[in-house]
């Protein structure tokens, strides 16, 4: 075993249930055994767990509920305590303490809360405690609608300063086509950069209990790799998969980390869920992507959502493609008023100004 490393393991609902309606406790026991073995060898382990909704449904006897957000939140509220109790019981067999962290998008959108979450997570690791992380499903409406503990695990990996992120799923990895419908599909073993062609071949999970698919796993891999974290998508059912990944043995699809990872502040910008979005014209698109320029108000065509100065927003071209994320220097109302105008007109329009740019290039990450 090499020197101590930090590994974030994301366990999807399909892995925890084996594709059934209830938690597969025997399989979870085996996953905990693998994690405990690495922990005993001096490695730092972080668990990002799905399954709260599935656990709640099982505990309540599979009630027939309307397909609403409130129903999912009800199940999550019941299931979260059952889920964390299970993790605690299983890790205690090996004398390992766990610490629960429930996060929401707001914890990532706000820089101060992001740093507080980072400090808490690293304090747990420094004291040999295994953090068990989940999205706060009972209150995080946006997470359940869009859903994805995949992206949450990438953010957890950034918070933890992880060396590797392992996304365990019900598939062997990323294939050249959907292996369920195309027998010619081949496993892609190594990925050195995520592009539109790769996104186009990503299929969705068939599990009806979870909320993520292969598309969200690609998003998570993109975020983690750009932060300097190797990411692996592999089958949770593969014997010894967690130990194999830590030992560098080939398993599933490996997304290789960028050689020059983003600095800490830009990791936050890249990982934070956008509070809104703006659409920019062709000139602004070229300036941002080709010359690394700041975004001026003149290039803004439209503003979507309500957000405050200092929040992370998405920047899109007129075809609707994401080109960057950045910290806005003006709130959404102000941007709507100065959109399409020259920077010299900002003070006359608003009665104040925070500088000539809408998003500075130092506060921007291109996609």
UniProtKB/Swiss-Prot annotation:
Its main location: cytoplasm. GO terms for biological process: L-proline biosynthetic process. Its EC number is 2.7.2.11. GO terms for cellular component: cytosol. Residues 275-353 form the PUA domain. ATP binds at residues 10, 169-170, 211-217. Substrate binds at residues 50, 137, 149. Transmembrane segments: none annotated. The keyword Amino-acid biosynthesis applies. It catalyses: L-glutamate + ATP = L-glutamyl 5-phosphate + ADP. Keywords: Amino-acid biosynthesis, ATP-binding, Cytoplasm, Kinase, Nucleotide-binding, Proline biosynthesis, Transferase. InterPro entries: AceGlu_kinase-like_sf, Asp/Glu/Uridylate_kinase, G5K_ProB, Glu/AcGlu_kinase, Glu_5kinase, Glu_5kinase/COase_Synthase, Glutamate_5-kinase_CS, PUA. Pathway: Amino-acid biosynthesis; L-proline biosynthesis; L-glutamate 5-semialdehyde from L-glutamate: step 1/2. One of its GO terms (molecular function) is glutamate 5-kinase activity. It is found in: Cytoplasm. It comes from the Bacteria. It is an enzyme of class 2 (transferase). Belongs to the glutamate 5-kinase family. PANTHER family: GLUTAMATE 5-KINASE (PTHR43654), ISOPENTENYL PHOSPHATE KINASE (PTHR43654:SF1). Catalyzes the transfer of a phosphate group to glutamate to form L-glutamate 5-phosphate. HAMAP family: ProB. This is Glutamate 5-kinase. It comes from Citrobacter koseri (strain ATCC BAA-895 / CDC 4225-83 / SGSC4696).
């Amino acid at each position: 075993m090499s020197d101590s490393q930090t590994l974030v393991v994301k366990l999807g609902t399909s892995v925890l249930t084996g594709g059934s309606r209830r938690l597969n406790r025997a399989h979870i026991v085996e996953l905990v055994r693998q994690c405990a073995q690495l922990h005993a060898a001096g490695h730092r382990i972080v668990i990002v767990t799905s399954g709260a909704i599935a656990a709640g449904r099982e505990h309540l006897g599979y009630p027939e509920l309307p397909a609403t957000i409130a129903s999912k939140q009800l199940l999550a509220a019941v299931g979260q305590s059952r889920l964390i109790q299970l993790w605690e019981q299983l890790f205690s067999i090996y004398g390992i303490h766990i610490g629960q962290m429930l996060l929401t998008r707001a914890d990532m959108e706000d820089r101060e809360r992001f740093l507080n979450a980072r400090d808490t997570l690293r304090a747990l690791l420094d004291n040999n405690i295994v953090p068990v992380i989940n999205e706060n499903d009972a209150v995080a409406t946006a997470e359940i609608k869009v859903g994805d503990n995949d992206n949450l695990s990438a953010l957890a990996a950034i918070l933890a300063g992880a060396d590797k992120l392992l996304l365990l799923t019900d598939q062997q990895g990323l294939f050249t086509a959907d292996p369920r419908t195309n027998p010619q599909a081949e496993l892609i073993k190594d990925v050195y950069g995520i592009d539109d062609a790769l996104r186009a071949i990503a299929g969705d999970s068939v599990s009806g209990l979870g909320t993520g698919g292969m598309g969200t796993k690609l998003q998570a891999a993109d975020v983690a790799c750009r932060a300097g974290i190797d990411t692996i998508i592999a089958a949770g059912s593969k014997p010894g998969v967690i130990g194999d990944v830590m030992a560098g043995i080939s398993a599933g699809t490996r997304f290789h980390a960028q050689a020059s990872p983003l600095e800490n502040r830009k990791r936050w910008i890249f990982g934070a869920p956008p509070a809104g979005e703006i659409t920019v014209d062709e000139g602004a698109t070229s300036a941002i992507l080709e010359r690394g320029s700041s975004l001026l108000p003149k290039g803004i065509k439209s503003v979507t959502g309500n957000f405050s100065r200092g929040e992370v927003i998405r920047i899109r071209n007129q075809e609707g493609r994401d080109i960057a994320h950045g910290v806005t220097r003006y709130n959404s109302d102000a941007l709507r008023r100065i959109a399409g105008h020259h920077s010299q007109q900002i003070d006359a329009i608003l009665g104040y100004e925070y500088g000539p740019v809408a998003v500075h290039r130092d506060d921007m990450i291109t996609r």
